[in-house]
Amino acid sequence: MKINIKTFLAVGLIGLTSACSDLDVDVNSYYTSYPSSDIAIAAKMADIYYSFAGPLNRRYDEAQSLSSDEYVGLSFSGNYIDNNTYSNMSLHLFSQDDASTGYYADVASGISKANQIIVDLGGDAAKPNVIAPARAMRAFFHFILMDSYGDIPILDHLAEANEVIERQPRADVAKFIEKELLAIIPYLPSDNTQVTYGKPTKWMAEALLVKLYINWPVYTATSVDKYDATSYNNEKLSSCVAYCDSIILGGKFNLSEGATGYHSKFFADNSYKVKDFIYAMPYDTKTLLGMTYARFRTWKKATTGVSYYGWSMGNSCAGLFALTPQMSDLFTLNGDARNNVILSDTIKVYDNGVKTKTNWIYNGSPQALNKNITLLAQDRDLNVGENTNGYNQGYKSIKFLPVADDYNNHGRSQNNDVPIFRYADIL
């Protein structure tokens, strides 16, 4: 979609291309104080908002998707083995060298940017509503790191030169996130419009609290390996329900508005109009490249001839993300609209996202996917073979359907926005 957050750039560029003959410059321009205009603040804030775009596109997505019950990270007789980073996620054989878990620095950088703008805008003396968005993003980034890595440093200030900030227990980080969110929610915007899309709002912060609270016993457990889900007591459950109710009663969201069906919510033209999205990353092939989900989820040789998307793919596909049989079962239910996001059984051709009855042909034959994945060997490579049989192992996701111009002309990037918090999660 075409994002609105960066419209301030156009204003700046217009100024750069205009001649100037008026030398009566305001005296403030002689100083290096931080600009206080709305445009200047928006420019600085946008850098924070987009800090998670890179990890969400690739490494964070790999770590979350492949280590869950959703996908398996396959290899093809050595192709896409990549030091077992993908299969390690699926088998929970994590290594410090795995690229798929290497997003810590990018997310921590977002925290540093947030801390810098908080200082630039006045720190503790700043108006609460001015720095609330930066504090919200700082809390969100802490959540991502805490959820992924456990014990992490609490980065609530700009570090001094050579300052060592020690890791804190996961429980303390969770409590810090909670404290921050409770403090800033009253100062965040409560609108849900094109202007607030992709930015922290009251609803984004409340949705983050819900996610924090629903897993509170895990995050605050003395030791996760000793946590017993059958006997825990969630002291935050009432608060979790209360914030769900707040989002529901706010009346800003619903499951269907802005979409023409479940699958269309995730198409390349999705945007702020999709009222199921509480908080989303607004990828755009013109201004925010990097959303490349189709590259890893598309059948490996779909680039041969015309793809099952209905157009020729000019860039190669990895094809290594295969849905687990258990996940596939959830999306192959009779009469369920969500079935449309899964490529299953005999592959059909699609026409502008609509499944046709025409078989897709590869090397002269229709192709049929196997729900139950067969490996060539029972080892950590998860090798299915570099051949048609291997490519057909596992159903594939077409949830974030690509379009030709994006994929072929922008380095496999896509316009599809990625929801981080959805109204469906709250319900």
Please state what every model-predicted region is:
Residues D38-L56, S77-Y149, E163-K175, K179-Y197, ...:
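Conserved, well-structured interaction surfaces
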Residues M146-S148, P153, N215-V224:
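Short coil/turn linking the two alpha-helices of tandem helical-hairpin repeats
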Residues M45, Y49, A53-L56, I81-G102, ...:
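Elongated scaffold/linker segments in the mid-to-C-terminal portions of large proteins
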Residues M1-S18:
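Sec-dependent bacterial lipoprotein signal peptides
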Residues R135, E206-L209:
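TPR/Sel1-like alpha-solenoid repeat signature
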Residues Y34, I39, R59-S75, L158, ...:
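Short, surface-exposed recognition loops and adjoining beta-strand edges that mediate ligand/DNA contacts
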Residues C20-S67, F94-Q96, N234:
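Membrane-proximal, proline-rich intrinsically disordered regions
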